[in-house]
Amino acid sequence: MATIHLLSDFKEFLRLLNAHHVEYLLIGGYAVGYYGYPRATADLEVWIALHPANADKVVAVLKEFGFDDPELSADLFLKQWQIIRLGLPPARIELTTTISGVDFGECYAAQVTDVVDGVRVNLIDLDHLKTNKKASGRHQDLADLEHLP
């Protein structure tokens, strides 16, 4: 697969997700790059499983990462179609609870786990990534779809 370089904050965040056993999948531009179409991206997009135990783990990760806001609660990660953004592009981290066209459980069961720039990462598999890109229908997603194998 393609060589990908992660910002140090992204590496730290992914390591924390792994250390806390968060059920997550890397999606978006970094996943597209992993499958052979490296392109500029403004953020690290992470899809998280939507259930209470996982939401608690995500909150623990965010606090350890330095994002300890009084409004931070597990409830933020228990709603469908929720997107939480941390930081600014190109170093933004985006957490989402739902994406178009695919089911987290199915995607998690089919995940690809690999070491990316020295960090173990759970990625959405290529078939589900393509399904998501097609279902999303955004211009960038359709362009990605044309370049994926």
Q: Model regions: which residues?
A:
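Compositionally biased terminal segments of proteins
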Residues: 1-149
